A protein has these predicted regions:
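Conserved long alpha-helical elements within nucleotide-processing catalytic cores of c-di-GMP signaling
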Residues: 1-3, 18
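A short, structural micro-pattern
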Residues: 72-74, 104, 113, 150-153
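Catalytic/regulatory signature loops of cyclic-dinucleotide turnover enzymes
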Residues: 103-123
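Hydrophobic alpha-helical membrane-association signature
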Residues: 1, 37, 41, 102-106
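Intrinsically disordered, glycine/charged-rich C-terminal tails and inter-domain linkers
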Residues: 86, 116-200
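Catalytic core of nucleotidyl cyclases, primarily class III adenylyl/guanylyl cyclases
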Residues: 8-36, 44-102, 120, 126, ...
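Short, conserved phosphate/pyrophosphate- and ester-handling motifs at nucleotide-, phospho-/glycolipid
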Residues: 34, 110, 149
Length: 200
């Protein structure tokens, strides 16, 4: 798991800010890079030669849909957000850049809502990736949620692609869904183009 994460970062312009006990905080140049990396890693993890002892565990066993393997081995939760950090300083222990600010809290909250094998992001970050070509066909908007320590409700998107679209997940865990009739967000390139025209 750790080896897969670290060996793939450079190809997607990723930088490991922190990695400990199987949890990573990673910075990317653009949300598009982060989306592509997350989905590649989720796919690679299906092909890792996991030990039989691990595969016998309910949280790591093989699952299929039709003839396709949907889960196998460790199921990693991932959360993607974007924004400006308040400040950065080198970690005294590792020397790596450490970032601080509200965006860090949001990233932790979004990642914490995901189930194993699921990748979530906030809708504003999804827009940034979609506007530069990230395909929308297999992603799904799952609604507004109230997150601890975050002032406004956050629209969450489940990010996926053709290789992972057979995965299914239970409802978001640990957050209260917010019902807002004015929330008309859709995962549609047409809607994004309309929004750009209407934007002042």
């Amino acid at each position: 798991h750790d080896a897969v994460i670290r060996s793939t970062l450079l190809s997607f312009r990723g930088y490991e800010c922190r990695g400990e006990n199987g949890k990573f905080f990673i910075a990317f140049h653009h949300p598009f890079d982060a989306f592509r990396w997350c989905l590649v890693v989720q796919t690679i993890l299906l092909r890792v030669p996991w030990e039989d002892k691990l595969l016998q565990q309910p949280q790591a066993c093989n699952m299929t849909a039709g003839h396709r393997v949907t889960f196998k081995g460790l199921r990693v939760t991932m959360g993607i957000v974007s924004g400006e950090a308040t400040f950065m300083k080198p970690c005294q222990r590792t020397g790596r850049a450490e970032y601080f600010g509200q965006v860090l809290n949001l990233s932790a909250r979004v990642a914490g809502l995901a189930h194993g094998g699921q990748t979530l992001c906030d809708k504003n970050t999804w827009k940034k990736a979609a506007e530069v070509g990230f395909p929308h066909e297999h992603s799904r908007y799952i609604g507004l949620y109230s997150l601890r320590g975050v002032m406004d409700p956050v629209g969450l998107v489940q990010v996926s692609d053709a290789s992972l679209n057979m995965r299914s997940f239970a409802s978001v865990k640990g957050a209260q869904k917010v019902i807002d009739p004015t929330d008309k967000f859709r995962l549609s390139i047409k809607d994004l183009e309309t929004e750009r025209i209407d934007r002042p």
